UniProtKB/Swiss-Prot annotation:
Gene3D superfamilies: 3.30.70.100, HAD superfamily/HAD-like. This is Putative NipSnap protein K02D10.1. InterPro entries: Dimeric_a/b-barrel (IPR011008), HAD-like_sf (IPR036412), HAD-SF_hydro_IIA (IPR006357), HAD_sf (IPR023214), NIPSNAP (IPR012577), NipSnap_domain (IPR051557), PGP_euk (IPR006349). Disulfide bonds: none annotated. GO terms for cellular component: mitochondrion. It holds the Pfam family Hydrolase_like. SUPFAM superfamilies: Dimeric alpha+beta barrel, HAD-like. GO terms for biological process: mitophagy. It comes from Caenorhabditis elegans. Belongs to the NipSnap family.
Amino acid sequence: MSINRISKNELLANYDTFLFDADGVLWTGDIPVPGAIEWINLLLEDPSKKVFVLTNNSTKTLEQYMKKIEKLGFGHLGRNNVISPAIVLADYLKSNADKFSGEYVYLIGTENLKATLENDGGVKCFGTGPDSIRDHTDGDFIHKVDMSIAPKAVVCSYDAHFSYPKIMKASNYLQDPSVEYLVTNQDYTFPGPVPGVVIPGSGATSAAVTAVTGRDPKVFGKPHKPMADFLLRRAHVDPKRTVMFGDRLDTDIMFGNANGQLSATPIQCQNESENSEPQKQGWISRLLKGQSMDPSSWQKQSHSSLLSNSELMYEFMTHNYRPGEQDAYLDAFGKYKNEMNQKNPSIELVGSWTCAYGRTRDQAIHLWRHNKGYEDVDSSISLHGKDSGIRAADNDVAKLCGRRKNLIVKSFSYWREPEQRPPNHVYDLRSYVLQPGTMIDWASAWAKGIQYRREANQDVGGFFAQVGQLYVVYHIWAYPSMSGRNDTRHATWAKPGWDATVANTVPLIKKMQSKILTPTKYSQLE
């Protein structure tokens, strides 16, 4: 596996222009990534450096976006530091004033995008909001829509009012080859604040229009060329001295690669210092302290400090209860859980399951989160040795079991932390015993591959062993049913790029197994 080496000092010496994706790189939701503000300010203070935030979000005006940036603490960034598809598209319309100035554009998009295109692009937009045709229930098909306005272009973007009449109008306008077909970006989904809720993006609207018309659009967002051309015109950047920081392979990294820039992902940023102490850091915090993208530097740190930026510890508790004793076992375990909650509330039971399919049938698996890290692990050891209530409850569980084991694990930084899920799911616990020395290679491959396994919100957690059998990885996936699991896995294989993840990880595996789990009444993961 070939990974280029680069340090912070080399970045500053060899690169003049720094491009950043926004959500997931500089901030997550409404929380700045640790070290991001300091890194941006450091670059802005150097007059020889150019800094740009490249977002694919066209739902906000520039003024609204700047207010968000300032609120997050990035107040040193100015209007000229932010580039969005809406800005690039407006510039395109303005640059072709002989065709578009004062002319109509049919817009499948938001009122904010309309304001940007009209104010900065010099066009007149129509089509936003709910479609004006109210009732299509009197027949099987719509045979006629209002085509009285003749636009010079059709623009597709995110539109919460997207509808069949809009597809029909756009498709009919585009029958005229002189009408240009313009798209802000082709992101099929947007990140959102509610786990499990899929938010269709601009790519969903344009895909429908493209399918009907057979026309290929001109796309203005990452990874397409118009945004790179706009950047060249605005800043006269040298691609060979430009670095693109992003978290999405299909937009950010592809954009950098396609335009001759250095591409960097958060998983690549590692601390070079041998003596630095483990801290809860973001990838930019590590970059500020000195980064490396060279496997030789990984030997200077423990695997856990490279693979996880969380202080949380997790514990897999596996109990093989006696056949026919499941109800009695779960009652005893419930009392044990209550004792633990009372004696140390920061040790939290996240998941609790019994095995429906797998190597061992009469088995329960519980996932505990130690919110204070090793402090909670020490507390658990002490409680099991000295507290009479814990010892009694633990003994009652043990009497119903033939075999028990406890493993300490940490979560990979590129996975989410396990979050509470509503009913009803089946869970697939996959364990992989890796060849010694291959954990970094595994993480590097999966940091890219995980993007292919998130569209159905199936990713629950990914962990690597700290105590117990080492070089073992655990992945937990959630599905609405076994048939849903089958459909989701088939859909993953249809995605270009997933096969590369499999090809890169299978040679690293010594042994693997899958268990299908169903939640108990104690589980937050239902």
